[in-house]
Structures are given as C-alpha cells and as structure tokens.
C-alpha cells in the first residue's frame, strides 16, 4: 500500500509541475490571457509543497520522481495535446518507471 501511495504522490506532484509550466507556455506561445499566470504560480507552489511530502532525501526523491514525471508527461501528450503515443514512448516510460521502482524500493538504511 505504501508503494501505491507514493506512486500517487509522485503522479500528483508531476501533474502540478506540468500544469504550472503549461499555462505560461500557453501565454507565451499562444497569446492566451496573462491571468493564466495566477493558476500557474499556484500550481508550481503546490508542486514545491508536494515535494516536501516525499519520504526520502531530496536528491533521491528527485531521481525517483523523474520516472513518474516522464510517464505523466506522456499522458499529457496523449490526452491534452491529443498526440498518439508510439511504442518508443511507451517503452521509454516503462523503463523510467522500473528505474523509479528500483530507487523507491531499495532496502532501508536506517
């Protein structure tokens, strides 16, 4: 159950980061309203706070989080941008998630 909770926390953290970066991209690249910068800042603030909830040292958290970030970013590509994923996308995400699991499930040193 702990692994599932951690995976959900990683996924929500990644989503907060992606939203926080996507909204300014809309403002800068597509000329959307500057008001989108308000929820973007809130989302990035949420992202930073969520990082504090992760149970490992910061460096290990960032390393493991990277695997989930890749998977969530590809989900964003598919469901928000509407671009079909390739087998290479899916294979890369699977490899990244396995790497995340190796880091997260290592034996405790305490």
UniProtKB/Swiss-Prot annotation:
Disulfide bonds: none annotated. Keywords: Cell inner membrane, Cell membrane, Membrane, Plasmid, Transmembrane, Transmembrane helix. InterPro entries: UPF0060. It is found in: Cell inner membrane. It is a multi-pass membrane protein. Signal peptide: none annotated. It comes from the Bacteria. The keyword Transmembrane helix applies. The chain crosses the membrane at residues 8-28, 33-53, 65-85, 88-108. One of its GO terms (cellular component) is plasma membrane. Its main location: membrane. It holds the Pfam family UPF0060. NCBIfam families: PRK02237.1. Belongs to the UPF0060 family. This is UPF0060 membrane protein Pnap_4944. It comes from Polaromonas naphthalenivorans (strain CJ2).
